[in-house]
Amino acid sequence: MKLVDLSITEFAKVLGSDAPAPGGGSAAALSAANGISLTKMVCELTIGKKKYAEFEDHIKVVHEKSAHLQDQLLEAIDKDTEAFNVVSAVFDLPKETDEEKAARREAMQKALKHATESPFSMMELIVEALETTKEAVGKSNTNAASDLGVAALNLKAGLQGAWLNVLINISGIKDQDFVQEYHGKGLELLQTGSDLADNIYQTILESLS
């Protein structure tokens, strides 16, 4: 059964068990999925309201983007655990002969690269989700303004969590060109996303103060 098909209670219990997966990566993806779900909700609470008629077309576009990102981030919950399981499986490979040891090392490097690409892709989705959320600020139902703030917080948590997973995976990769590429691009995504999240949160905070 997929993680996304579990109830909230079931997911929390398996997350808190002694099973190594799901772990922080899947939890980060869930945080991000919750964030963009709130953005989508705010759009739904805005569409069709006369008070926000001038923003109707704009918010419909934001809603469509949010729905698409929601699907992708929900998929990321399982993708992260699947990537971790590939790494775990390598530890079970034989290592008696030199050939087996070499094959195991090669398999581990390949698995770690795949495990790095998963949270990195998540970071890209989250930055897109934050950009989408920002598009709703000031043009959506003010009664749900706090929900956009919570959306930004959840998305930022997901972003930071995904970044930590990128870092822990590249720490075991020997291909320095790969490491430098993902570290550099990851830092850029982290900065861009964090700035967006902070801007959204501060704007909402000031509007409610």
Predicted regions and their residues:
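Preference for long, well-ordered alpha-helical segments
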Residues: 129, 144-203
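A structural-propensity feature for long, helix-poor, extended segments
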Residues: 51-87, 189
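Amphipathic alpha-helical interface segments
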Residues: 80, 84-153
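Amphipathic alpha-helix face/heptad-repeat signature
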Residues: 30-34, 62, 69-76, 115-125, ...
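Polytopic transmembrane helical bundles with strong interfacial aromatic enrichment
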Residues: 4-6, 121, 168-169
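Conserved phosphate/anionic-ligand binding catalytic regions in large, soluble enzymes, centered on
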Residues: 17-40, 144-162
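Short, hydrophobic/aliphatic alpha-helical segments
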Residues: 3-21
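Phosphate-handling active-site elements
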Residues: 38-58
